[in-house]
């Protein structure tokens, strides 16, 4: 090791050093010329039909519009010069700079002479696009570092647009010497200022350590933005958390996406410093550790909220197959049979879910307002009736599906939350479940277990299909164009026929936003029980055998693509005859509901309003969309009315108080009033008493037991009394 300390002679191989540098520069110049040749000479079309110079014309058009960018397809570059495309794929950071310089030279040639005031040539940003199959975030390992990658995902957070210096000038505080035009590396890498000033000034003392500072007014900057990308839900293995990746966008790629967008990213898999320090900055560990991010070179937004996840990736053969499928006369029954085939019964409910998956047509009115096309559905009733299983199936079947449970969902988790960005300390917004499901379906299980405050938060998302946020200085509106499929139990766990509408513990404001409300009862029917038991046992016995396609069913992958195709290609409207029929039936429906309210002397908790008329329109449009028809016919309206009849109308009339359990007469009303007054006399405010003893005492006085239950339920709903000690004791509040 003594040779390293020898101050005598220093040997170096100086031969060929300059030549090597010259060769590197010559290679870069040659590659730049080839890139320039590609941009100038690449053409589309044939000599017979006429051809155009694709990138040359695009550069000229964009430059004249003041848009200093161009999108290059990797397939075009590979067909022109495969070696160049290979260089760009394996060493994108180095060769992209040459491509941008070449684009700037071509832009200079095609835009001369430029108008007065615009003589200075602007830099051109090159964005990349490719038809190659994307890889997942999980597949990005160290061997793909600094390579070009293409990954899909959902944008869940976006920072504000900030400035980053591309060229800086620094000045010494002591001797005021300056170093100008220092190039900065693109991406999230910083720049380490020189520790010493190397200016030779005879007769002056040496400059101190760390003398340089940046001169902000002499720096050249570009816009940049950081995004947070999350794995697609269907790409996450069971039982694992979705992974995230930080994205760096600059110049014209800023503000191209918002949280909730499904995107495919083309970029360079890069690393940045990942300093691990203790609280006071001492004991640095992990010096060699780097955290990964992607420097974005191209963004493709996969969906515009219409569920077009698969529509662009379909072959002509698939499209032809789907058109033949839609032309089948029994397509409606075929689709409803394919909805959760392992679940027995519930035919009408499956047909309603089929309508929800296809959806109606979103309409934009001349005054700028919109009418939603998505259908919302509520399943309400007994436990053990496969409600959650249906929700799980719809999540898998929908082109975009998000499943959440009511108890574990907050208002912010469903809509959007505002968080502080750890790097910039600014507030940023992260979209919740209803924003991430834009263009698909949100499945909310245990809807009745949600807190009322959280349930109110989705009112706007269900009807207006937007989420308005005004928090921490951020005021904005996010899109949530999605259907809501909710499942809930009744107030008493099981549906109690004697309680009527008291089984439903939802406000009319939320119930009116559901297009269809199904009451699912576990009825005791021996014949049905035999068939159900046989079906369930068959499922358990044949669960491990190889899956075989059942005749008359569409398999899940094909159904998912068919739904996406229909949603993308078809937007039907009501025909004139169907509209007239619907108008007449709606008037009859309203009068029937009004008569029922008059007879029962109370307002129904499930109202029949204009929203329900629009619901029937949407159901009819969905039925027409399954057949890829431009207009909904009278038959579609008839089926939509039937579905509405067996769901919402039956639910609205389920609380009928006529017959044995009824209180429709004046005598019954007086009986209720008498029981309530006597109950309040012996039950002081602030006291508590056993519910069982009250019922026993009043029964001894010859009052009917169902009437006593009715009074207690009314007082509970009005908030005058409340249950305590596992619903055994009643406590009077007012």
Curated annotation (Swiss-Prot):
Top EC category: hydrolase
Modified residues (N-acetylserine): 2
Cell location: Nucleus; Chromosome; Cytoplasm, Cytosol
One GO cellular component term: CMG complex
GO molecular function, one term: ATP hydrolysis activity
GO biological process, one term: DNA replication initiation
Residues with the N6-acetyllysine modification: 392, 396
Chief localisation class: nucleus
Residue ranges of domain MCM in the record: 331-537
Claim: Nucleotide-binding is one of the keywords in the record: yes
Pfam hit, one: MCM_OB
CDD domains assigned to the protein according to its UniProt record, in alphabetical order: MCM5 (cd17756)
Residues involved in ADP binding: 371
Keywords in alphabetical order: Acetylation, ATP-binding, Cell cycle, Chromosome, Cytoplasm, DNA replication, DNA-binding, Helicase, Hydrolase, Nucleotide-binding, Nucleus, Phosphoprotein
Keyword Secreted: no
PROSITE patterns the UniProt entry points to: MCM_1, MCM_2
Motif Arginine finger, residue numbers: 512-515
Role this protein plays: Acts as a component of the MCM2-7 complex (MCM complex) which is the replicative helicase essential for 'once per cell cycle' DNA replication initiation and elongation in eukaryotic cells. Core component of CDC45-MCM-GINS (CMG) helicase, the molecular machine that unwinds template DNA during replication, and around which the replisome is built.
Family: Belongs to the MCM family.
Name listed for the protein in its UniProt record: DNA replication licensing factor MCM5
Source organism per UniProt: Bos taurus
Gene that encodes the chain: MCM5
